């Protein structure tokens, strides 16, 4: 069996960025940053949403994203719009078909 194939499982400090709530949980998360929490030093993982800030757990309706992804995109690139180039008809480039089309039928035996 190969050794050192699995990441190290250890206690990690998770910090909710929006509320500042901290909790320790076992994880394989790798981090260079560490913080002291309740007298012990832990690697730190910053999360944007946790049980202390998620509307399902808090019971409040907190609107996180004021604009949708499409609105942000349109706002960012609205001044860059360029008119689309119309393809030129290439009637002269194609030769006109001459003669009749061949119809292929099966012969009866």
UniProtKB/Swiss-Prot annotation:
One GO BP annotation here? translation
Q: Where is this region: Disordered?
A: 79-109
InterPro entries registered for this protein in UniProt: Ribosomal_bL28/bL31-like_sf, Ribosomal_bL31, Ribosomal_bL31_B, Ribosomal_bL31_sf
Superkingdom of origin organism: Bacteria
The record's GO CC annotations read: ribonucleoprotein complex; ribosome
Concerning its family, UniProt says:
Belongs to the bacterial ribosomal protein bL31 family. Type B subfamily.
**Known partners and oligomeric status:** Part of the 50S ribosomal subunit.
Protein name, as recorded: Large ribosomal subunit protein bL31B
Q: Which organism is it from?
A: Chlamydia pneumoniae
